[in-house]
Amino acid sequence: MNINEWEKFSLFQWQECPSIKILHDSVGNKISCIGKSTKRIAIGTLDGRIVILNSRLQLIRDFYACEQGIVQQIYITADQSALCCVVLDKQNFVYLQFWSLNPSKKTNSNSPLCLYEHRLYGIPNPPFPATSLYVSIDIKTVVCGFANGLVIRVEGDFVRDLGSRQDIILREKDSITNLILYSPKKLFVSTTTQVMVYKIKNNTKKVISNHGIPLFCSIQYQGKYIMCAGGSFLSVYTTPDMQLQNTYCVDGTFELLFSSFGLVFVVYTRKNGENGLENNSSIREIKALDVEKRYVLYESLLEQSYDNIFFNSFDCIFFSSTKVPCQLIRLPSDFVLCKMKGKKEHKDAFKIANYLGSPEDTIRECALAAAGECRQQLNFQDATYYYIEAIPFSDSAEIIKFYLEKKLIKELTSYLEALSAKGFAFSHEISTLIYLYIKLRKLDKLTEYVSGCPTEISLPILRKYKCLDQMELLGTIRKLPNVCMEVYQEKGDVEKAFNHLQVCNLPELLRTSNSFGIWLFNSDPMRFMKEAIRNIEILNSQGKDKELSNILKIVYLGIFSQNVQIQLIFLDELLKSKKSENVLKFIYTRKLYALMQKELQHSNPQNELDALQIIHDSQGLLDYESSILCLQAVSWKQVTDLLYSHLSLKEGQDDSLIQQIISDPETVKTLSETYSSEDALHVLKFFVRERSITNKYEDILYKILEACFMQFRIPIQHVLNILVKDGTLNFCFLKPLLLKWMNDYETRIHQNDDEIQVIKNDIEKKRQLLGTIQDSEKVCDNCEGLLDVPFVSYSCLHLVHRDCATETVCPKCKAGYLDKKNSHDQKKTSTFSELFHDFESIDSVML
């Protein structure tokens, strides 16, 4: 990929730094090499000095490593505790040195301490300059490259100066430009013409690139890449396999390659033939590259006078002999975004926000603004892209409406797909996308999409537009047997429908829609009946009586109701296995009803015989009330009488009083001692009904009637209301009983008359007694008010108002007691008028 194709963002800005000019002037043009780390910068000079700066470019060390010598290469160790350098002394000897960067604890001095010094042998005299230096992470190995192609390795404990061993591992014909020990056994070597990997253990080398272009600078970037620059090309290799990942090209020649701010900076020169200038004139440019994301984050012209560059991980300063030093600073991301928004560069703002890893809300805001910009420019394809990136900030309802108005179906589909993929599609968006898939005939996408959509949204749309295959898939995935059956019914695929019954829950299916059962029954009655019986037997074996009863009602009443023959076969099959009492009651009742239907269709005496057999086989497990009602349509007297008899006996079996009377009829004589008149009427109703069916228990019925009249003295009208319901009762049956009742009434009337006479005599005696009392003494012995009638007397002959007689003990003397005859609660007596009224009721019965 060509570097000119990268997008350009202004994330950096120049800033003059006059305060550090003095520092630069102190070393001036004597700089020979620079070593950097995250916290320090080390500068070597041509007069043997080493100047160490901190991250703020403040001087912290300034010492001579070799007086009157030259510092050729500097390397700061990975832990930044020591500095390694290659120096050339005044006698042209080359030395390898290690200097401590931390204050000495023994001497309490801040002066640098030389930890190790070793003369390098094998270098011709006069020596070629050292061009590259690399120290391993564990500070146990140092490799140094020279301009004559020589590579020397020194191994030892340099920090503690415990000795070392020197080897010449390579002799190349070209100058060494860079060395990187990226693993303990592999050394990256670049020369001015080729790139290679040297395996230290095997003493072998593998040439990676040999294109003849001078390669004079290379760096290790983020521990993952090794980059080599030469001519117009920048090659990026991955470690540790050293595979060429990318090659970038510039319209010029590379001068410098370094890493700072986590980016790769390249400085190159190119010829300038623009603006009327001569073609042989050249300009310098600097670019900041993000190698992984392939962005040019900064691009600027660079003055020719800037000949020295100090840089570390977070600083990059350019020095010139004629101008004030300038620092390249990285702008805050918020500032860059605000600047772009102010210029309405919304697209670039979105890309910058993405690159900088801004908060998601910030990225979405930028994307939404960029979408609006593209929409104004009628660039709907890009607008869709930004709308997607702005989810969920984008107004989906407004976008759908706009796209539909403009008939931008493709863009709308893309937007809705992204909305669904990000989980922000709701009912309106989901239904719209399903509709688009159907109309665009994208059935594969429709099938995939509906499998993950809510059923309540997708199913109605699929049903409306007859997307049967998708409905079947949805029913299979979501385990919706009714949906699958609906598809089979729509297709008329009976065989597949019956096969589906093998794996689905038939009761659940029929509860959802009875139309499926009717369709299957009409298609193949016997096959459906067998399937229904199979499901019923499964429920029966599991003991699920409630569900079994429900499906029986659904299948029998809703599906088999029009086919009597199937009903009888179905019920006979069910009776072959053991069932609960409730289920058997339903089966026998419906079987009796089916026979009645059969009789209505074609009369046959055998039908009544079969009905009698069903009643006998049911052993009381029959719904007698409903059976009696339904059999009113046919003239089966024997069946009806038998049902009434069984019903009566069934009711009597649950009544302890009736069972007691049946077992011992003499109990009736003492019925009033234990039971009330309501109980007597209840017993009377039962025996009247039972007699009308079987002509049994006449003697008990007579005794019950006698008890109602004589013991409980129930008004005859209540008794007659019960008796008239029985058409078999006649006056001959009632005559003896009525005569006895009349005699009893006469006796009671005479008894009442005698009681009245006794009361009258008592009143007369009281009146005479009252006449003997003096008028002055006729006061109430309780309230001492004037005594008037009515009054009561105590046994002690004290008299009180009737209202004052609230106690049974005399309130005057506390010795007497209230006369019982005075407080006698007279019962209501029967009169001849009442008797004659009852006679009229009897006459109405006889008539």
UniProtKB/Swiss-Prot annotation:
Keywords: Cytoplasm, Metal-binding, Nucleus, Zinc, Zinc-finger. The keyword Cytoplasm applies. GO terms for cellular component: cytosol; endosome; HOPS complex; nucleus. InterPro entries: Clathrin_H-chain/VPS_repeat, WD40_repeat_dom_sf, Znf_RING. GO terms for biological process: endosome organization; intracellular protein transport; organelle fusion; vacuole organization; vesicle docking involved in exocytosis. CHCR repeats lie at residues 387-526. It is found in: Cytoplasm; Nucleus. GO terms for molecular function: protein-macromolecule adaptor activity; ubiquitin protein ligase activity; zinc ion binding. Pfam families: PEP5_VPS11_N, TPR_PEP5_VPS11, zf-C3H2C3. A zinc finger (RING-type) spans 780-814. Its main location: cytoplasm. This is Pep5-like zinc finger protein C16A10.03c. The lineage of its organism: Eukaryota, Fungi, Dikarya, Ascomycota, Taphrinomycotina.
